[in-house]
Amino acid sequence: MAFVTRQFLRSMSSSSSASAAAKKILIKHVTVIGGGLMGAGIAQVAAATGHTVVLVDQTEDILAKSKKGIEESLKRMAKKKFTENPKAGDEFVEKTLSCLSTSTDAASVVHSTDLVVEAIVENLKLKNELFQRLDKFAAEHTIFASNTSSLQITNIANATTRQDRFAGLHFFNPVPMMKLVEVIKTPMTSQKTFESLVDFCKTLGKHPVSCKDTPGFIVNRLLVPYLIEAVRLHERGDASKEDIDTAMKLGAGYPMGPFELLDYVGLDTTKFILDGWHEMEPENPLFQPSPSMNNLVAQKKLGKKTGEGFYKYK
């Protein structure tokens, strides 16, 4: 009797696992909205892993620039990866680019896609308008995902009729190099959608981690308050920015100090995230604005990209 019971339970378990696996969507066709640094990076890694990818932006000029950047990135990767076999490197670049196409008409391509990844400017109104429009044209099974780093996924998903097929996919810059992807599950995101996205991230060679739809998710929720506290330490005159950076590199083992990292990321980017959180939770001491950072942003001193931030760059 015990043997029969074990066999029955094993059979039920196998059937259940097979059924659950069958429910997941195998993502083969990906549409990336936004040809900027993040969107182009996401498109590149998806194409490099054999997915059919369409990169969408407003103009052909933007897309041409994006595709050129992707090609240059692939050539650099091929040179490092295929040092002993340049021909294999050329084939890798050619094969990846053959999986990638571009379009200025998102509505015309989403009807046949498995996944839409949005990587446009961090503006809730624009994201809502985009997804509300795409929702009318996308296939029933299509999953929507936002690469937002600061907005809540629920507030973006509410513009659609597919909240159960909506989640966050937060990649990190530079996308081809950074292994981490935060998969954000809202209260409405189905388990099928979540598992499909986790599997997709793994096919990209990434390491997915899961987080609820909380401000900043995991990395930014820990990182931004740390960066701002370093700025406050400097604002109070407790230590110089140089000594703070040195202390965190030599004492905590961080590869970059907080001021170096702020300049690398862009002061405007960090300010945008902090301002959004402060608006949501004005009494939270972690989210209070930084006068010195606000002053630098007002002067357009945004970090390395403008030649000056907390430090000056030649």
Curated annotation (Swiss-Prot):
EC number(s) given by UniProt = 1.1.1.35
Residue positions binding CoA: 73, 80, 149
- Record has Oxidoreductase as a keyword: yes
Look up the record and name the pathway of this protein: Lipid metabolism; fatty acid beta-oxidation
State the SUPFAM superfamilies in the record. Answer: 6-phosphogluconate dehydrogenase C-terminal domain-like, NAD(P)-binding Rossmann-fold domains
InterPro entries assigned: 3-OHacyl-CoA_DH, 3-OHacyl-CoA_DH_CS, 3-OHacyl-CoA_DH_NAD-bd, 3HC_DH_C, 6-PGluconate_DH-like_C_sf, 6PGD_dom2, Mito_3-hydroxyacyl-CoA_DH, NAD(P)-bd_dom_sf
PTM comment, free text? Succinylation at Lys-81, adjacent to a coenzyme A binding site. Desuccinylated by SIRT5.
Q: Which reaction does it catalyse?
A: a (3S)-3-hydroxyacyl-CoA + NAD(+) = a 3-oxoacyl-CoA + NADH + H(+); (3S)-3-hydroxybutanoyl-CoA + NAD(+) = acetoacetyl-CoA + NADH + H(+); (3S)-hydroxydecanoyl-CoA + NAD(+) = 3-oxodecanoyl-CoA + NADH + H(+); (3S)-hydroxyhexadecanoyl-CoA + NAD(+) = 3-oxohexadecanoyl-CoA + NADH + H(+)
The protein's GO terms of the molecular function aspect are:
3-hydroxyacyl-CoA dehydrogenase activity; identical protein binding; NAD+ binding
Site note Important for catalytic activity applies to 170
PTM sites of type N6-acetyllysine = 75, 81, 87, 125, 136, 179, 185, 192, 202, 212, 241, 312
Pfam families attached to this UniProt entry: 3HCDH, 3HCDH_N
Keyword list, A-Z: Acetylation, Cytoplasm, Differentiation, Fatty acid metabolism, Hydroxylation, Lipid metabolism, Mitochondrion, NAD, Nucleus, Oxidoreductase, Spermatogenesis, Transit peptide
Q: Which family does it belong to?
A: Belongs to the 3-hydroxyacyl-CoA dehydrogenase family.
Q: What does this protein do?
A: Mitochondrial fatty acid beta-oxidation enzyme that catalyzes the third step of the beta-oxidation cycle for medium and short-chain 3-hydroxy fatty acyl-CoAs (C4 to C10). Plays a role in the control of insulin secretion by inhibiting the activation of glutamate dehydrogenase 1 (GLUD1), an enzyme that has an important role in regulating amino acid-induced insulin secretion. Plays a role in the maintenance of normal spermatogenesis through the reduction of fatty acid accumulation in the testes.
What protein name applies here? Hydroxyacyl-coenzyme A dehydrogenase, mitochondrial
**Taxonomy-wise, where does this protein's organism fall, top ranks first?**
Eukaryota, Metazoa, Chordata, Craniata, Vertebrata
Q: Which gene encodes it?
A: Hadh
